[in-house]
Amino acid sequence: MTESTSRRPAYARLLDRAVRILAVRDHSEQELRRKLAAPIMGKNGPEEIDATAEDYERVIAWCHEHGYLDDSRFVARFIASRSRKGYGPARIRQELNQKGISREATEKAMRECDIDWCALARDQATRKYGEPLPTVFSEKVKIQRFLLYRGYLMEDIQEIWRNFAD
Protein backbone atom coordinates (compact mmCIF):
# COMPACT_ATOMS: atom_id res chain seq x y z
CA MET A 1 0.00 0.00 0.00
CA THR A 2 1.41 3.41 -0.88
CA GLU A 3 1.71 6.22 1.63
CA SER A 4 -1.17 8.16 0.04
CA THR A 5 -3.57 5.20 0.21
CA SER A 6 -2.61 4.38 3.80
CA ARG A 7 -3.71 7.91 4.81
CA ARG A 8 -7.15 7.46 3.27
CA PRO A 9 -9.89 6.70 5.78
CA ALA A 10 -10.61 3.02 6.36
CA TYR A 11 -14.18 3.48 5.07
CA ALA A 12 -12.95 4.85 1.72
CA ARG A 13 -10.42 2.04 1.34
CA LEU A 14 -13.06 -0.58 2.22
CA LEU A 15 -15.54 0.93 -0.22
CA ASP A 16 -12.95 0.96 -2.99
CA ARG A 17 -12.13 -2.67 -2.27
CA ALA A 18 -15.82 -3.68 -2.23
CA VAL A 19 -16.49 -2.04 -5.59
CA ARG A 20 -13.43 -3.74 -7.10
CA ILE A 21 -14.60 -7.14 -5.79
CA LEU A 22 -18.16 -6.66 -7.05
CA ALA A 23 -16.96 -5.41 -10.45
CA VAL A 24 -15.57 -8.86 -11.23
CA ARG A 25 -18.75 -10.84 -10.46
CA ASP A 26 -21.80 -10.83 -8.21
CA HIS A 27 -21.22 -11.96 -4.64
CA SER A 28 -23.53 -12.79 -1.76
CA GLU A 29 -23.42 -10.46 1.21
CA GLN A 30 -21.64 -13.09 3.29
CA GLU A 31 -18.98 -13.61 0.60
CA LEU A 32 -18.37 -9.87 0.37
CA ARG A 33 -18.06 -9.55 4.15
CA ARG A 34 -15.55 -12.42 4.22
CA LYS A 35 -13.46 -10.93 1.40
CA LEU A 36 -13.49 -7.45 2.93
CA ALA A 37 -12.31 -8.84 6.28
CA ALA A 38 -9.43 -10.76 4.68
CA PRO A 39 -6.03 -9.07 4.69
CA ILE A 40 -4.87 -7.37 1.49
CA MET A 41 -1.66 -8.59 -0.11
CA GLY A 42 0.62 -5.61 -0.49
CA LYS A 43 4.25 -5.21 -1.54
CA ASN A 44 5.42 -5.97 1.99
CA GLY A 45 3.06 -8.89 2.65
CA PRO A 46 -0.48 -8.97 4.03
CA GLU A 47 -1.85 -5.64 5.21
CA GLU A 48 -4.90 -5.12 7.40
CA ILE A 49 -7.37 -2.27 6.98
CA ASP A 50 -8.00 -0.77 10.41
CA ALA A 51 -11.76 -0.54 9.96
CA THR A 52 -14.48 -0.67 12.57
CA ALA A 53 -17.59 -2.83 12.42
CA GLU A 54 -19.51 0.35 11.60
CA ASP A 55 -17.29 0.93 8.54
CA TYR A 56 -18.09 -2.56 7.27
CA GLU A 57 -21.82 -2.02 7.82
CA ARG A 58 -21.72 1.35 6.01
CA VAL A 59 -19.91 -0.22 3.03
CA ILE A 60 -22.42 -3.09 2.82
CA ALA A 61 -25.35 -0.64 3.09
CA TRP A 62 -23.82 1.58 0.38
CA CYS A 63 -23.40 -1.41 -1.94
CA HIS A 64 -27.04 -2.42 -1.38
CA GLU A 65 -28.31 1.14 -1.95
CA HIS A 66 -26.40 1.57 -5.20
CA GLY A 67 -27.31 -1.83 -6.62
CA TYR A 68 -23.85 -3.37 -6.43
CA LEU A 69 -24.94 -6.00 -3.91
CA ASP A 70 -28.22 -7.87 -4.40
CA ASP A 71 -28.60 -11.40 -3.03
CA SER A 72 -31.67 -12.19 -5.17
CA ARG A 73 -29.81 -11.23 -8.36
CA PHE A 74 -26.80 -13.22 -7.18
CA VAL A 75 -28.95 -16.31 -6.54
CA ALA A 76 -30.67 -16.14 -9.95
CA ARG A 77 -27.36 -15.76 -11.79
CA PHE A 78 -25.70 -18.47 -9.71
CA ILE A 79 -28.50 -20.96 -10.45
CA ALA A 80 -28.33 -20.18 -14.17
CA SER A 81 -24.54 -20.50 -14.22
CA ARG A 82 -24.34 -23.76 -12.29
CA SER A 83 -27.19 -25.36 -14.25
CA ARG A 84 -25.40 -24.48 -17.51
CA LYS A 85 -22.38 -26.33 -16.11
CA GLY A 86 -24.55 -29.41 -15.58
CA TYR A 87 -25.19 -29.30 -11.84
CA GLY A 88 -28.53 -30.32 -10.37
CA PRO A 89 -30.81 -28.57 -7.89
CA ALA A 90 -29.56 -30.35 -4.75
CA ARG A 91 -25.94 -29.41 -5.40
CA ILE A 92 -26.88 -25.82 -6.25
CA ARG A 93 -28.93 -25.51 -3.03
CA GLN A 94 -25.98 -26.80 -1.01
CA GLU A 95 -23.54 -24.36 -2.63
CA LEU A 96 -25.91 -21.43 -2.05
CA ASN A 97 -26.26 -22.45 1.58
CA GLN A 98 -22.45 -22.41 1.89
CA LYS A 99 -22.43 -18.91 0.42
CA GLY A 100 -24.78 -17.68 3.15
CA ILE A 101 -28.00 -17.50 1.16
CA SER A 102 -31.15 -18.24 3.15
CA ARG A 103 -33.17 -21.35 2.38
CA GLU A 104 -36.24 -19.18 1.61
CA ALA A 105 -34.37 -17.06 -0.95
CA THR A 106 -32.93 -20.19 -2.56
CA GLU A 107 -36.31 -21.93 -2.80
CA LYS A 108 -37.96 -18.80 -4.22
CA ALA A 109 -35.29 -18.51 -6.92
CA MET A 110 -35.48 -22.25 -7.71
CA ARG A 111 -39.25 -21.95 -8.23
CA GLU A 112 -38.82 -18.89 -10.46
CA CYS A 113 -36.10 -20.37 -12.65
CA ASP A 114 -37.35 -22.07 -15.78
CA ILE A 115 -35.09 -25.13 -15.86
CA ASP A 116 -36.17 -28.64 -16.80
CA TRP A 117 -33.98 -30.60 -14.37
CA CYS A 118 -34.99 -33.98 -15.81
CA ALA A 119 -33.93 -32.96 -19.33
CA LEU A 120 -30.71 -31.52 -17.95
CA ALA A 121 -29.98 -34.78 -16.10
CA ARG A 122 -30.59 -36.77 -19.27
CA ASP A 123 -28.26 -34.46 -21.23
CA GLN A 124 -25.52 -34.95 -18.64
CA ALA A 125 -25.97 -38.73 -18.70
CA THR A 126 -25.89 -38.96 -22.50
CA ARG A 127 -22.89 -36.63 -22.67
CA LYS A 128 -20.93 -38.87 -20.31
CA TYR A 129 -22.23 -42.33 -21.25
CA GLY A 130 -23.41 -41.90 -24.84
CA GLU A 131 -26.69 -42.36 -26.67
CA PRO A 132 -28.60 -44.60 -26.15
CA LEU A 133 -28.14 -44.90 -22.41
CA PRO A 134 -27.07 -48.36 -21.24
CA THR A 135 -29.78 -50.73 -20.01
CA VAL A 136 -27.53 -53.09 -18.04
CA PHE A 137 -28.20 -52.74 -14.31
CA SER A 138 -24.56 -52.15 -13.33
CA GLU A 139 -24.26 -49.36 -15.92
CA LYS A 140 -27.53 -47.80 -14.73
CA VAL A 141 -26.12 -47.72 -11.20
CA LYS A 142 -23.00 -45.90 -12.44
CA ILE A 143 -25.14 -43.32 -14.23
CA GLN A 144 -27.34 -42.90 -11.17
CA ARG A 145 -24.31 -42.40 -8.91
CA PHE A 146 -22.84 -39.86 -11.34
CA LEU A 147 -26.09 -37.86 -11.49
CA LEU A 148 -26.58 -37.97 -7.72
CA TYR A 149 -23.04 -36.61 -7.31
CA ARG A 150 -23.87 -33.82 -9.75
CA GLY A 151 -26.83 -32.88 -7.54
CA TYR A 152 -29.84 -34.28 -9.37
CA LEU A 153 -32.80 -35.60 -7.42
CA MET A 154 -33.63 -39.30 -7.48
CA GLU A 155 -37.06 -38.61 -9.02
CA ASP A 156 -35.44 -36.84 -12.00
CA ILE A 157 -32.99 -39.70 -12.44
CA GLN A 158 -35.76 -42.31 -12.32
CA GLU A 159 -37.76 -40.28 -14.85
CA ILE A 160 -34.93 -40.79 -17.36
CA TRP A 161 -35.43 -44.56 -17.20
CA ARG A 162 -39.25 -44.29 -17.29
CA ASN A 163 -39.09 -42.22 -20.46
CA PHE A 164 -36.27 -44.31 -21.92
CA ALA A 165 -38.55 -45.90 -24.55
CA ASP A 166 -39.57 -42.47 -25.91
Curated annotation (Swiss-Prot):
GO BP terms: DNA damage response; DNA repair; regulation of DNA repair; SOS response
GO molecular function: enzyme binding
UniProt subcellular location: Cytoplasm
Keyword check for DNA repair: yes
Induction comment: By DNA damage, via LexA, as part of the SOS response.
Disulfide bonds: none
Gene3D superfamilies per the UniProt record, alphabetical: Winged helix-like DNA-binding domain superfamily/Winged helix DNA-binding domain (1.10.10.10)
Function (record text): Modulates RecA activity through direct physical interaction. Can inhibit both RecA recombinase and coprotease activities. May have a regulatory role during the SOS response. Inhibits DNA strand exchange in vitro.
Family, as annotated: Belongs to the RecX family.
HAMAP family named among the record's database cross-references: RecX
Protein's UniProt name: Regulatory protein RecX
Biological source species: Escherichia coli (strain K12)
Taxonomic lineage: Bacteria, Pseudomonadati, Pseudomonadota, Gammaproteobacteria, Enterobacterales
